[in-house]
UniProtKB/Swiss-Prot annotation:
Residues 342-351 have a biased composition (Basic and acidic residues). PROSITE patterns: FTSZ_1 (PS01134), FTSZ_2 (PS01135). Essential cell division protein that forms a contractile ring structure (Z ring) at the future cell division site. The regulation of the ring assembly controls the timing and the location of cell division. One of the functions of the FtsZ ring is to recruit other cell division proteins to the septum to produce a new cell wall between the dividing cells. Binds GTP and shows GTPase activity. It is found in: Cytoplasm. During sporulation, is negatively regulated by MciZ, which binds to FtsZ and inhibits its polymerization and the formation of the Z ring. Gene3D superfamilies: Tubulin/FtsZ, C-terminal domain, Tubulin/FtsZ, GTPase domain. It holds the Pfam family Tubulin. One of its GO terms (cellular component) is cell division site. GTP binds at residues 21-25, 108-110, 139, 143, 187. It comes from Bacillus subtilis (strain 168). The lineage of its organism: Bacteria, Bacillati, Bacillota, Bacilli, Bacillales. Belongs to the FtsZ family. Homodimer. Polymerizes to form a dynamic ring structure in a strictly GTP-dependent manner. Interacts directly with several other division proteins. Interacts with FtsA. Interacts with Phi29 DNA replication protein 1. Interacts with the cell division inhibitor MciZ. This is Cell division protein FtsZ.
Length: 382
C-alpha cells in the first residue's frame, strides 16, 4: 500500500528568481501558467521593465550604479549591480531550500548578475539550479561571446546548470514563426525547465518526489540538459517519452548523464500504465548505471496531452568540449533491455532513492521483458 506524507511543515521552500529581461519573462510565463508551490522574485537593473513583472517580489538592483536605466548590455554593469545589492538579495533568498536562477544569457543584467545571485543562494545553503538560454545566432557574435562568459560563470556558482540553446528552439517551431514568437518560445522553454522540476516537489501528483531525491540528482552536478516531449492520442505516453529523449534541446545523448530526473505530466485521465511506459523508455535510453528518479503530476488543463520533461545531469565536461558528437537517431539512442551497455568511467554513485530506476547487469527472464524495469524490481521486493 502506498503511503503519503502529510506533514505540511516539511514542504521544501522553492524560490524562482528571474534575472534581467529573459528571466523576468520566464517568471511571468510561470505565473500565467499557474505554477504552484513556488515564490517568485523578479530582479532587474531596468526599473521600467521591472514594473511589467507579475512577480510578488520585484527587486531593482544597482540603483546607485544604473539609476534604474538598465545595464546597457554590459555584463560588468550587471555584475556590479548585483554586488551593490547583495544584502537585499540575501534577504529575499533567506530560508529557501531550493533556488532556481533563470536568465537569458548575452545581455547585461542576466549575464552579469545571475552568477552573483546564484553564488549568494548557494552560500545561503540552498540547492541552486541555473536555467539559462544561449542566444540565437542571429543576435550577433557579441551576445554569443558575452553569453559564453556568463554560462562559464554560472557553472562555477550553481549546483546544476541547465543550458537551453535558443537555436535548437528553431527546430521545434515552424519556419514561418515571427521573431517575437521565437523569443516568446525561448521564454516558455525556460519556464518548462523550472516547472518540470518544481512541480515534482511542490504539486500533488500520482507520484511525488522528496526534496532529498531531487537534491541527490542535482547537487554539485555541473552541466545539465533538458528534453521536452508532448504528444496526444493512443500511444501518447510512449510518443512523448521518445520525443523528450530525442529533443533538439538535448545537445548530447542522455546516456552520457550521471543522473536523470523525469516528469510525466498529464490530465486527469493519465494512467499509471502510461507513467510506467514513459519512464521505462527513458530508462532504456539511459546509461545502465544512471541514477534516475521520476515523478508524475496531474494538470487538469492538459486534457488529452501528455508532457514528458527529462533533465539529464552530470555530463563529463571533456565529452562535451571535444567536437560535439552528432545526436544519435532515436533508434540508436533507445537501447533494448537485452542489449549489453558498456559501463562508463568514472564510476557512478549508487542510486539512493526508492524511486530510482536501477539498471541490473543480470538479464531478466524472457517472459518479464515486457514488464517495465521498476515494476519488475517492485515485484521482486514484494
Amino acid at each position: 500500500m502506498l503511503e503519503f506524507e502529510t506533514n505540511i511543515d516539511g514542504l521544501a521552500s522553492i524560490k524562482v528568481i528571474g534575472v534581467g529581461g529573459g528571466g523576468n519573462n520566464a517568471v511571468n510565463r510561470m505565473i500565467e501558467n499557474e505554477v504552484q508551490g513556488v515564490e517568485y522574485i523578479a530582479v532587474n537593473t531596468d526599473a521600467q521593465a521591472l514594473n511589467l513583472s507579475k512577480a510578488e517580489v520585484k527587486m531593482q538592483i544597482g540603483a546607485k550604479l544604473t539609476r534604474g536605466l538598465g545595464a546597457g548590455a554590459n555584463p560588468e554593469v550587471g555584475k556590479k549591480a548585483a554586488e551593490e545589492s547583495k544584502e537585499q538579495i540575501e534577504e529575499a533568498l533567506k530560508g529557501a531550500d531550493m533556488v532556481f536562477v533563470t536568465a537569458g544569457m548575452g545581455g547585461g543584467t542576466g549575464t552579469g548578475a545571475a552568477p552573483v545571485i546564484a553564488q549568494i543562494a548557494k552560500d545561503l545553503g540552498a540547492l541552486t539550479v541555473g536555467v539559462v538560454t544561449r542566444p540565437f545566432t542571429f543576435e550577433g557574435r557579441k551576445r554569443q561571446l558575452q553569453a559564453a562568459g556568463g554560462i562559464s560563470a554560472m557553472k562555477e556558482a550553481v549546483d546544476t546548470l541547465i543550458v537551453i540553446p535558443n537555436d535548437r528552439i528553431l527546430e521545434i517551431v515552424d519556419k514561418n514563426t515571427p521573431m517575437l514568437e521565437a523569443f516568446r518560445e525561448a521564454d516558455n522553454v525556460l519556464r518548462q525547465g523550472v516547472q518540470g522540476i518544481s512541480d515534482l516537489i511542490a504539486t500533488p501528483g500520482l507520484i511525488n518526489l522528496d526534496f532529498a531525491d531531487v537534491k541527490t540528482i542535482m547537487s554539485n552536478k555541473g552541466s545539465a540538459l533538458m528534453g521536452i516531449g508532448i504528444a496526444t492520442g493512443e500511444n501518447r505516453a510512449a510518443e512523448a517519452a521518445k520525443k523528450a529523449i530525442s529533443s533538439p534541446l538535448l545537445e548530447a545523448a542522455i546516456d552520457g548523464a550521471q543522473g536523470v530526473l523525469m516528469n510525466i505530466t498529464g490530465g486527469t485521465n493519465l494512467s499509471l500504465y502510461e507513467v510506467q511506459e514513459a519512464a521505462d523508455i527513458v530508462a532504456s535510453a539511459s546509461d545502465q548505471d544512471v541514477n534516475m528518479i521520476f515523478g508524475s503530476v496531474i494538470n487538469e488543463n492538459l486534457k488529452d496531452e501528455i508532457v514528458v520533461t527529462v533533465i539529464a545531469t552530470g555530463f563529463i565536461e571533456q565529452e562535451k568540449d571535444v567536437t560535439k558528437p552528432q545526436r544519435p537517431s532515436l533508434n540508436q539512442s533507445i537501447k533494448t533491455h537485452n542489449q549489453s551497455v558498456p559501463k562508463r568511467e568514472p564510476k557512478r554513485e549508487e542510486p539512493q532513492q526508492q524511486n530510482t530506476v536501477s539498471r541490473h547487469t543480470s538479464q531478466p527472464a524472457d517472459d518479464t521483458l515486457d514488464i517495465p524495469t521498476f515494476l519488475r524490481n517492485r515485484n521482486k521486493r514484494g
